[in-house]
Amino acid sequence: MTGQGSGGWQTFGERTVYDDRWVRLGLVDVRAPNGERWEYHVVHLARIAVALLVDDTDRVLMLRRYRFIPGQWGYELLGGLVEDGEEPAATAAREAAEESGWAPVGEPTKLVGFEPLPGNVTAPTEVYLWREFDRIGEPTDTEEVGTVEWVPLSRMTDLAARGELLGAGTLVAVLYYLASRPCGGPGSNRQPDGL
């Protein structure tokens, strides 16, 4: 890769240092725009799909849980790794049902796609919005231990400021959704244009 579209960066190949189902670590042979050449560490994570379920009283379905890596409690949206051959929206719907016992209904609106750490990590993330869903039972995913809660949108900026919205998928999704809504003040249940 070279030229204007690559910002002057050139890549000459990548060798894998570690690889499993969850993560692949590679060393990419690169030349920077300043002419220096070296092996750059790149972490490749699986594609991720996130479900944002918002009810008609402006509450968001979330999982309150403890994450041992940062050592903290907080709120997360539902979602997970996109399986081979699975569409991201289907992943988000499946994960929501497994983790919460609430199944999204109908076609979602794709809210946003992003790379959370583009400096040295690939983790393509897509967020889907549903405004309709059915209670189908208890959560079935035994690895996702936490409490399922409907959290008012009006609490989201405070939770974000306190660092209690865990993970980029949750933070980006919630703040994007809030920023996309027409001005209606706290508690407004008007939807973003086209949603």
Residue ranges, per PLM feature:
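Unchanged
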Residues: 38, 45-50, 55, 80-169
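A glycine-rich, hydrophobic loop/mini-helix early in the fold
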Residues: 47-72, 76
